[in-house]
Amino acid sequence: LELMQAKESDFPDGRSIWQLGTPYWGEGPYVGMKSKFELLVLPTASDQVGFLGQQFGLSIRRTQRWHDLVRGSLIVVTNVSENELFEDQKIYGHVVFNTAINLLDGFKHYSYDTPCWLREGLGHFMEREINPRFNTFDASEGSVGVRVNKENWDDEVKQLIAAGKAPRVAELTGLKAYAEFEMRHHYACWSMTKFMIATNPQGYACMTAMLHGRKREDGTPDSENLLDVQRAAFTQCFGMSYPQFDEAWRAWAIAQ
């Protein structure tokens, strides 16, 4: 709530019906979700596959975030063995990474996906606040994704900037799936998220609000043209175009 600059009273009680033409804050009191956010940590991948198969018809061995449409809840299901979560802080960080993404997606109700770079950026930001030694990377189905365990990401970002290889925000907004992420994208989305939260938390909250809870005139969820919405949000919330943001971020990142 602090990052989103929202109050518990902003969200509906889960019983009232939203009226067309009024601000939409979701379907229930849990940042817009009807039911509480859930977490299940199991000992082994076999335990996880058994649970997911019985509950949701899934057979996934690695960490899974899932929207239970019946109960209106977002859940994180993980297991210690497959994800090598053998240290307390690694478990803690991994859980926080995934729960932070669920909270972001669930803000004003999970009716559509938040852009990938913002989800991954917030997940990295929250996890690395706990211990930068341990880092989680999302992957698309059927892919192992990126698995690099460097600790000092500030130096990695500086090297990318110096080499002219740092992604621009326009490139990050165009990423449609985690399979498209290279390591430089992970570094950049983390650093840009940290930059926004550190230098303009009001702007970050404003952008998040603009992207979530969008409705068409008939009241159905509106996930169209999120690329245009993001560009408009940078102008409205940060007072910068994409090139201006890139320049400000690079200057800040080099100083870290």
Q: Locations of the language-model features?
A:
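Juxtacatalytic substrate-recognition/specificity segment
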Residues: 1-115, 217-219, 225-232
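Acidic/His/Gly-enriched intrinsically disordered linker/tail segments
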Residues: 61-78, 90, 110-256
